[in-house]
Amino acid sequence: MAQEGGAVEQFGQWLWSNPIEQDPDDEMVDAREEEGQILYLDQQAGLRYSYSQLTTLKPTPPGQSNSAPVYRNAQRFQTEYSSPTIVTRSQVSELSLSHTRPPIRQALSLLSSTPRASNQPWVATLIPSPSARPPPRPSGQRQLMGRNSRNQR
């Protein structure tokens, strides 16, 4: 079991540190890398984030007269939240091909979609919902359901 934990840790380190790779035949159009850190002093915690976006133009194969360009867009967004009691890592990767040039995104716009649970009061608050089940009938009544159903007593 200890070896499994070590292998998972090694894989996590590799996944966290490897950059997005570019196809050597593609022409680079846009590249963006952004890193940052946010400290939450009230919780003795911190959030580290990294965002990479690479857009390349795929070459038209010889003998093909395709006038529409093909863009390859690779994005990776990673976060690591650390507090005295927990460390949470998250990574989202996206690869797409398109005939239109994709927009450049900001890492902070992606951060707003990954809120911390302690800042969201509705996460910790349980709100009872009405039961979908009808209230129990008195024990003397039964209801049959079907084509020719009638109430029986």
Curated annotation (Swiss-Prot):
Compositional bias segments (type: Polar residues): 109-122, 140-153
GO annotation (BP), single: symbiont-mediated suppression of host innate immune response
Localization in the cell: Host nucleus envelope
Chain coiled-coil ranges: none
Superkingdom of source: Viruses
Listed GO CC annotations: host cell nuclear envelope
InterPro entries named among the record's database cross-references: Luteo_VPG
Main location: host cell
Residues spanning the membrane: none
Keywords, alphabetical: Host nucleus, Host-virus interaction, Inhibition of host innate immune response by virus, Suppressor of RNA silencing, Transport, Viral immunoevasion, Viral movement protein
Keyword Plastid: no
Region called Disordered, residue ranges: 1-24, 107-153
Domains as described in the record: The N-terminus forms a amphiphilic alpha-helix, which partitions into the nuclear membrane.
Function according to Swiss-Prot or TrEMBL: Transports viral genome to neighboring plant cells directly through plasmosdesmata, without any budding. The movement protein allows efficient cell to cell propagation, by bypassing the host cell wall barrier. Acts as a suppressor of RNA-mediated gene silencing, also known as post-transcriptional gene silencing (PTGS), a mechanism of plant viral defense that limits the accumulation of viral RNAs.
Protein family (similarity comment): Belongs to the luteoviruses movement protein family.
Protein name: Movement protein
Organism for this UniProt entry: Barley yellow dwarf virus (isolate PAV)
